[in-house]
Amino acid sequence: MKEKKRIRILEPSVGIGNFLPLLIAKFEDKDEVIFDLIDIDNHSLIVLKAILEKLKPPRKFTFNLINADFLTHNFVEKYDIVVGNPPYRKLTNNKKLLTRYKSAAINKESNNLFSFFIEKAISLGRFVSFIVPKSLINSPEFDITRNLLNGQNLIKICDYGEKGFKGVKIETISFLLETACKTKSENIIIESYITGTVVEKKKEYLFSDKFPYWLIYRNELFDQ
């Protein structure tokens, strides 16, 4: 990504753009950055537009606000980065819409929206980074999703515990992966806000088929 001077970023379920100041700061060295910001809630986009007007980012940053359902929207572009915080909820009250979502999904065992978001993001971006519930790494519901992620070049997992969002008592993690990678790395970085550690370990060790879930804290003591 360092060599590219023009990049395109997609943030699905952007809300009011909590991540945008960080992204603007991170990519201020680029000549041009185009953001496609999508949300199903038009009110959130109205608020976001007002925030961007006050923020006044440099002109090299372009913001396209799209009021649509990310999961059903037809994208023409492919993206250098897809980043965000997809919704964490199961769709149970709209069977017709759930059927539509599942028809495009690989993991049909889950009704959780964030699982569908992960799959579509992988199809659209070179790099994908999402904050999602920690249940992704250990729930049987996401076995297929984990297999899909493991098929990409997983670079890093961060464990925030309950520190991801103030006032929200749900354990979250984030992941960073690369989709268009000819050679996958053997190691992955695990950063923990719980233990205050950053370690690099073999993927085959943490994601071993001997266990039904990912053991991101696996160590010699565990193996005894």
What is the meaning of each model-derived region?
Residues 26-27:
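P-loop NTPase Walker A phosphate-binding motif
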Residues 36:
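Conserved beta-strand positions in the Rossmann-like core of class I SAM-dependent methyltransferases
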Residues 1-2:
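S-adenosyl-L-methionine
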Residues 13-23, 32, 40-47, 70-224:
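Signature of N6-adenine DNA methyltransferases within the class I
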